[in-house]
Every structure is written in structure tokens, then in C-alpha cells.
Design a protein with these regions (language model features):
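N-terminal, membrane-interfacial amphipathic/helix-forming hydrophobic leader that caps
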Residues: 1-62, 78, 144-148, 155, ...
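Short juxtamembrane and helix-loop transition motifs at transmembrane-helix boundaries
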Residues: 1-8, 64, 88-100, 118-125, ...
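Alpha-helical transmembrane segments and their membrane-interface exit regions
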Residues: 43-55, 101, 160-170
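Transmembrane helix-loop-helix hairpins at the membrane interface
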Residues: 103-211
Length: 211
């Protein structure tokens, strides 16, 4: 009991409160264009993670090979999804990321999102409240993040929330097993294959099946 209390004392405020701050910004930015809003929300996560940076110290060291294990886990997770659901993914992603150039989508999905989201949800929230809480809140986070694109499509919003919770659980497991860097690598690999590649190569699933 004392050990848990000591761990929590490293945080300037409870991470539930930090998530509510994010939710407030998500609501306040609902009416601005999607691309700008997503950048703002990623920045909010990065700022919150920096505020909590003291809590990231003392993490156990993981060998560099664990980054490869995280990327491999992402590959194993992402390829079946791409092969089975590529047409649906292309349509959904076009709705969730409207008007973004390929370069902007790559920067956001593959570089910024994995870093910002894993630092907060796995490096902070999961560390304080556990794997399940981190996964469930990640599903809610994605629903809020993409809300303008799903507000008229309840089933898409539900799918985003449930898929986010499932991905969050997997990223959380990778984090517990191989460390935060591996979780970031896993997340980046999934985003690259599942969310970015269908945007730039619409027929990629058909090509892969033909190999």
C-alpha cells in the first residue's frame, strides 16, 4: 500500500484530472477544422506528458531489441486488419482525416500520435491506474479526438471507441512486457500499416494478397 502511495506522489495531479483537461480542450475545439484540431489535441497530450515528466524517471531499462519486438508485434497485429478490412479502412480514414496531405498524415499518424499518446496513456495513466484503465480511456480519447468526423455516424464512433480500447490494451501489454519504447514502436507500426498506407496506396491489400 505504501509503495503505491509513493508512486502516486510523483504526479503533480491525478491523471484522471489530466484526462478531463484533455476532454475540455477537445470540446472547446470542436468547431475548428479537423487537421488543426488534431494537431492541437496531440500538443495537449505532449504538454501534459511534459508536466508529468518526473514520473517517467526511474523506468526499468529495456534492451534496444525490445523496440524491434514492439514493431514486430505491431506488424503481426496490423497486417491481418489491413488484408481483411482495407476497403472499409480507406472509407473510414478519409472521413476521420479529411483534407490532409500525405505528408501531414504521415507526420501526425506515424510520428506525433504514437509518441504523444503512448507517453500519456502508457507512460503516465497506465502507470498510475493500471492497464485496463489506460486502455478504456484510450478508446474514449479516440472518440473525442475524431468526434467531428463521427458525430453523424454513431456506429463508426462506437467502432472507433471499441477499436481504440482494444489497441490500447495491446499497447499496454507491450509496454508492460517490453517497455514504453516498444509500445511506441508497436503503435507507430500499426498506424503506418492500418491507417496511413491505405490512404496513399488504396490497392495495397489486393497487392499483398497477390504475393
Amino acid at each position: 500500500m505504501g509503495k503505491r502511495q509513493s508512486r502516486k506522489s510523483n504526479y503533480p495531479l491525478d491523471t484522471w484530472v489530466a484526462f478531463l483537461l484533455y476532454a475540455g480542450v477537445a470540446a472547446a475545439t470542436f468547431t475548428i477544422d479537423a487537421a488543426s484540431r488534431q494537431v492541437v489535441l496531440w500538443c495537449v497530450l505532449l504538454v501534459l506528458s511534459l508536466v508529468y515528466r518526473q514520473a517517467l524517471r526511474g523506468e526499468p531499462a529495456h534492451p534496444p531489441a525490445d523496440l524491434g519486438r514492439g514493431a514486430a508485434a505491431g506488424l503481426i497485429l496490423a497486417l491481418p486488419i489491413l488484408l481483411l478490412l482495407q476497403p472499409e479502412l480507406t472509407a473510414i480514414i478519409a472521413r476521420l482525416l479529411p483534407g490532409q496531405s500525405d505528408a501531414a498524415a504521415f507526420q501526425g499518424l506515424v510520428l506525433i500520435a504514437p509518441l504523444a499518446e503512448e507517453l500519456f496513456f502508457r507512460g503516465l495513466l497506465q502507470k498510475q491506474h493500471g492497464l485496463v484503465a489506460g486502455a478504456l480511456l484510450y478508446g474514449v480519447y479516440l472518440l473525442l479526438f475524431f468526434l467531428p468526423g463521427v458525430v453523424d455516424f454513431a456506429l463508426v464512433g462506437l467502432a472507433v471507441c471499441l477499436a481504440g480500447a482494444l489497441f490500447g490494451f495491446i499497447y499496454g501489454y507491450v509496454n508492460e512486457r517490453y517497455g514504453l519504447g516498444a509500445a511506441i514502436a508497436c503503435h507507430a507500426t500499426v498506424n503506418l500499416i492500418v491507417f496511413f498506407m491505405p490512404l496513399v496506396v488504396p490497392d495495397i491489400a489486393r497487392w499483398l494478397k497477390a504475393i
